[in-house]
Regions:
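Acidic/glycine-rich C-terminal interaction modules and beta/coil loop segments
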Residues: 32, 51-152
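Short, positionally conserved secondary-structure boundary motifs
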Residues: 1-77, 149-152
């Protein structure tokens, strides 16, 4: 809450305000040795809304703008993707941010624990899956926790 000064000589009034969480909006790119997250802006959201998304610390969450059509219809070009960058080891199927061959991208991961393998899958059927024989060697940069659809 914050105090609003009185203009009539009375006591200042308290006004309830939502606590805000600041999330970096980043542009991920494949670096020579490690991917780079260049901060291009910030998004303010209420702490209450943030806690609905995740119990993670705010500095573990990065937002980024989706590019391309490989994950349509789940993620469209221009959507805002929220990623928990503290999750580096996938333990379940889901959407993850990966680095592979100098590229950074979001894909669906399907783990096959029985065969100790995995598949990186685009939701758009025009893009074939990528088989991974050693999923523990994947360069996982984080797990997608939410997608904000941007309608244009």
């Amino acid at each position: 809450s914050r105090e609003i000064p009185s203009t009539d000589g009375k006591q200042p009034q308290k006004q309830a305000t939502a606590d805000l969480v600041k999330i970096d909006i980043v542009n991920p790119s494949g670096g020579e040795k490690e991917p780079v997250f260049q901060t291009v802006g910030q998004q303010l959201i209420s702490e209450d809304v943030f806690r609905v998304l995740t119990p993670a610390a705010p500095d573990s969450i990065k937002a980024m703008i989706a590019r391309g059509d490989a994950m349509q219809p789940t993620i469209s070009d221009g959507d805002l993707i929220w990623v928990d960058v503290s999750i580096k080891t996938p333990t379940s199927d889901g959407l993850y941010l990966f680095a592979l061959k100098g590229e950074v991208f979001v894909k669906r991961l399907r783990l096959d624990n029985f065969n100790h393998s995995a598949a990186i899958i685009s939701d758009n059927p025009l893009y074939p899956p990528i088989g991974i024989s050693k999923p523990d060697k994947l360069s996982t940069l984080g797990k997608v926790i939410s997608v904000t659809k941007i309608y244009r």
